[in-house]
Structure formats: C-alpha cells, structure tokens
Amino acid sequence: MCGIIGILGHEPVAGQLVDALKRLEYRGYDSAGIATLEAGHLTRRRAEGKLKNLERRLEQHPLTGTAGIGHTRWATHGKPNETNAHPHASDRVAVVHNGIIENFGELREQLKHQGFKFESETDTEVVAHLVTREMKKGLGPVEAVAATLPQLKGAFALAFLFEGEEDVLIGARRGSPLAVGYGEGEMYLGSDAIALAPFTDSVSYLEDGDWVVVQRKGAEVRDSAGHTVQRPVIKSNAAAFLIEKGNYRHFMAKEIHEQPEVVGHTLAHYLDMTNGRVVLPEKLPFDFRTLQRASIAACGTAYYAGLVAKYWFERFARLPVEIDVASEFRYRNAPYSDGNLAIFVSQSGETADTLATLRYAREQSQHVLSVVNVPTSTIARESDLVMPTLAGPEIGVASTKAFTCQLATLACLAVAAGRARGILSEADEHNLVRAFVEVPRLMTEALALEPTIEKLARDLAKSQDVLYLGRGTSYPLALEGALKLKEISYIHAEGYAAGELKHGPIALIDETMPVIVIAPYDRVFDKTVSNMEEVAARGGRIILVTDPKGAEHASVQTLATLILPEMAATVTPMVYAIPVQLLAYHTAVIMGTDVDQPRNLAKSVTVE
C-alpha cells in the first residue's frame, strides 16, 4: 500500500519525512520521494527502490525546507521508476496520492488537448494538472482543490503542497485513510497514526469525503459538501505500531472500512490499467496452456475465496479445478498428474494444514502457487510463485480485508489464465479489467449501507439460528457469511446453495428463522426467487442482498432488502462481502462479544 506524510515544521523536515516513510514500509512500496519548499520553491527528491536510495539522493542533494510532503509508492499506473515516483508536480503544486483515479484516462486526454504536458504514466499527475488548471483561472490553492475534487472518480487520499505557501498543506480523503497530527506549533498529515507517531500522539482521522486545510496554527476540516466540520482529536497509541484502531471501536470495523483502499492496491498490483491488461510476472514457472487441471487448498475464509475462484477459473479459462479444505486434502492421498498447478491460499502463510498439503503437492510434481498476505512466510518461501495480497496487517481474528484481497488476486489470476489459454479475447480482458477498476468505488458505496445494516442487526441478534443462501459465486459468500456470524456473534448459522434448500434445510424454516439471501440480478436470479417463495410460504424472515434490478423483480415480501449498485457479475463476490461482514459485525457488537478476539479462535492456525 502507498504511504503519505506531510509536515509543517520549524526545522528542516526532510529527515522527518523519511523517518515517517520508514514507519510505513510495512505497507509495501517500490519507489519513494519527498518535496519541500526551498526558499518558497517546490523541490523534489525521488528514487526507485528502497528508502535507502532516497536517503542517498538526499545526502548528495540536501533539502532544508520546513514544509514538505512524502510518499512511498506501489506502482499502479506506470512502471516503478523515478519518473513515476511521487510527489508529482505541475507549475505551483506538488501532490502525493494513495488510491486509483478511475477516470484518469479521460481527464488525461482532456488536459493534453488543453496543452498540458505529462512527464509520467501515472494517474496522480492528472490531479496536479487539474489543480494547476484551476489556479490559472485565478483561484487560490484552497479554492483550486475544492474545484478539483469533484472531477475525480475513484477511491483515494491526497496531500498537496503549494509553491510560495510555506504555511499550507491540503489533504483529501475518499475511500483511502488520511489522518491529521497536531504538534506544538507544527502540524502533520499521514496515511495513519503509525506514520505520525514519532511526532505526535494527538491525531484526528478524516471521515470519508472530508478534505482539510492544515496550517501551523491548526486544521480546518470540510466535508464533501464544503461545510466546516469538527473531527475529534484523540490520543494515539501508535508507538505500539499496529495496535491502533483510529476512530473505530474494533479492529474488525477498521479493517472492513479499509477494503476500498487495500483491494484497490491489490488489484493495481496485478493490472495494467492504462492498457486494460492483467499483468503477472514476465516468466511464470508453468505454462497455463499445458495445464490439464488445477487444485486449490485452503482453510476457513481462505477456502471460501478458493471456492469463488473455482467458478472463475472454470468460466474464464475452461480449466477444471478441484478444491478441498486443506485438512481433508492432505489426508486423501489424492492422485495428481505431473506438471499441473496447485494453488494455496492463506492470510498468514503459516497455516499448518495448508502448508502440509503444499508439501504433498510438491512431492507429486505440482507447480506450487501461493496467495498469501505475508510474502516472507513459510508457504510463500516454499512456493514456485507467490502472489501477495496487499491487505496490510489484519488484526481482527475474523478475516475481512484479507478475504476480499484474496478474491481480487485470484480473479486476476483466473483472467490471466483465460487469456493465456485463448478462452478470453483481448476485448474480454479489457472489459474485465474495467470492471475490476470499479471495485474500490463500489465497495465505498456498499459501506454507505452501514446505518441500515446496524438497525437490521438488532433484529438478527434476537435469533438462535440463521440461514444463508446463494447460487453461483454467491454460494461461497453464503458460506462465508454464516462463518462470520457464528465466529464473532456465537449465533448458529449455516450457509447453503439455494438449490439445496428443499433437500433438508427447509425443515428448519419457521417464523423465527432469518434467511439471508445473497442474490444479484443474474441468470439464476429467478431460480433464487423461487427458493425465497418457499421460505416465505413457511413464515421465514427474508433479508435480501441484491441490486436495483433484483429488488424490482423480487416478488417476495422481505424483512429487509439491502440494495447495492449494479455491477459486473465477476466482481459481485468482492463487493457483496461488505454487507455480509457488516451484518455479522454489528450483530456481534449488540451481543456484547469480543469481536476482535472471539472465544476459542486464533488469527493464524499454525497447529494441526
């Protein structure tokens, strides 16, 4: 994940900027840079690779300014090199950016026609030029940013530094986190409190849609409508590094809300958004074209991510996939054909059963690919190819952002397989990449349902049993929803394929039974409506998670209908996961359980 820092100080800030960026290294990065005001003039130092390269550059060409911004970058638009490293500048403004500007292509062409010259391949440079365009109309820095933000589509965090403005930083947040730090006559902006910890423990977290004008005397926060608002200043414990919830009551809530950002970063890691392509390592240790089958092994939530991936691989790549929970797979003595692909999914990369299955697959001459959140883990080290998820540290035991990042990674892998095997055309790939790019925005819109879901959880908390139903890729999501609810609320819940309702679960339906139906409007929607009618006829209380067309065509009375935006079918598991997670979370809060550390469960299961 990218990291952002901004400082208004009294002494030269270059060293402080680099120190803060070091605290953000855990997010991952491939280049870094800072910009300061030197006698009022914007001056940048940038470098590809690790921060030590930037430090060398600063030793050779020091900066002495007392106002500055800094950034660590994961490449999204454009290669990881010095030219594409942040900050980006245009005339009187420098900007650092975390996230994805979805409409950057359209804006870039518009700006080119107006005579703006681009040095980089990034979407960030578009933002710098847009602000410059507004300032050329006679607007000041604050007004120029206010005019620019509505032109941007996507999920992002931004920090601006302006030439000649020694006492102004401007930050903006939409979908990606940004915090304001308060010091003694000094002020700070940062991706999180971890970056700000060396300087201050007084931190205010911007809410989604907020933007802030920072001066040494304080900060003025405005919401998306431009109204001045107050955001509480809290004492941060970020000196303990990751033990920091921000404004959230639990880590799980924080991690649910981080998903637009981290899924965006994960997708960006595997996508060439400029050319509409999925990008994997240039030399794979196997050839998709010669594979006869693939297998997937995982545990818990990671297993459900693998179940979704099975649908994708079989649809996009016409590649048969066998999947099982690792604790079963490892003891089945399953027959393998030499030279096929074995995929292992694990948040920690240390899950014992998954690791044991990996070793068995290696003995059977399989190509081993892992999808992990810890690229230095044992599973990663023992794999032929590692595809990291960029979820960042996940503290809550119940997985949320790691799950959706696993889905994002596996989706990209399935599309790459389909392209390599000649099943997907170039146009198909472009369409899928466009759909993937929209996921962070769609997730942000899904999070807006939280107040409604919180009210609904009050009803769910009264239940002893809950049933989840889904078809297609919504079936694994039903399983995941049931797992989340039972993990953290301790309410018994089961997930079923909707078509299996009549083969047993229907016997449990009565007027006390909530039935959560995950059903975007797709080719099997009418079949799912038939199952809902069977539930309604027996008094079951239906909670429908769907889209506008689904809500319109569902001819069944529901206890509640949660309506998500219309989206491509491929991305529904990533986006529909959010209301499922929120429903479990708020039910658990009402039940008074230990949400982040539910009884009897551990984050990383390293025993068999």
For the regions a protein language model found, what residue spans apply to each?
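Conserved short alpha-helical segments that host acidic/polar catalytic motifs at enzyme active sites
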Residues: 1-245, 249-250, 258-292, 331, ...
